[in-house]
Amino acid sequence: MGDCFIVGTCLWILIYPFYAWRKRKGAKKTVGTIIRVLMWVYIWFYFAWGLNYFRFPFYERTGIAKAAFSAEKFQDFLTGYVGKLNESYSKAGDTLSGWYLERYTTAGPMSKIPVAGVIQEGYGKMASRFGLVEPGKFLRVKPMLWSRLMSRVAVTGYMGPFFTEFNLNQELLSVEYPFTYAHELAHRLGIASEAEANLYAYLVTSAAQEPAIRFSGYFSMLGYVVNNARRLLTEEQYQEIVKRIRPEIVELYNSHLLYWREKYNPGMGQIQHQVYNAYLKGNQVSSGTKNYSEVIGLLMSLQEDRIFQVGSVLQFPGTALL
């Protein structure tokens, strides 16, 4: 419904001036009508979901102290993460790699795994600890109506605020489906920050008993880990980290990047990036689209706080990183 509403509103804005002209409505009245409609859309956006942008920040809401960065701590984090990434691949099994790069479909191999049930159960266990809305059984993911268009601007999922629907791109690969589902569900449960949504998606998927879901969690975090490592480490240190990753995972990662790059349109993508960057900055996310990669800082802060060892209802695999 959200997709139809947005498209319908845009079409109305384009068509209404011609309708008003034919009905001999004055320009002032026409503009006034459009402004009033947009005002109500604006109000609807915030009352339906947008007020989540004004929640207390993660550290203030959870009482967790923000970790001070140090090269040694980051190296420890990377060592633990790469070890768990490799382990999750081993437990998932080499045979899975054949369909990880297939598009997710309701009839494909990944559909036999109860992704929605596992992830919603995980969120239910940690909702109170992190100030999330506990997921209801009525929640259902919606497919994007224009997935091919969204792929051209690198959008794999989004939260539809007007009807509080979370939507997934129908061109998602099986390897990324569980993590992306968990990320968008986090938005549906009241989390506006992209870094936080990544954090909870990672915690839920990497704690799952199902090997394919667990690997999806570690694998989907790899891009953010790589980006931070390139920025914070020397080239020699960076290459040393990459060498520790199983070659099968590196190959899968490169194939995954190629899959989306072939669909991406640089011109359209840049416009979407600038618009969404401005949108985030205008809604209390000062770092804009860079907020996605800030998930690494949240994870390192959780490690220092030792949240994983104080009676957490989920046995988060991050314990091994401490």
Ranges and model annotations:
Residues 193-221:
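Post-HEXXH active-site segment of zinc metalloproteases
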Residues 50-120:
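Membrane-interface segments at or immediately adjacent to transmembrane helices
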Residues 249-322:
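Pan-zinc metallopeptidase signature
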Residues 215-245:
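Acidic/histidine-rich catalytic neighborhood
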Residues 177-203:
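Active-site recognition of the HExxH zinc-binding catalytic motif
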Residues 1-20:
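Membrane-embedded alpha-helical segments of integral membrane proteins
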Residues 26-53:
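Internal/C-terminal transmembrane anchor helices
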Residues 97-164, 170, 174:
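Auxiliary, metal-adjacent structural segments of Zn-dependent hydrolase domains
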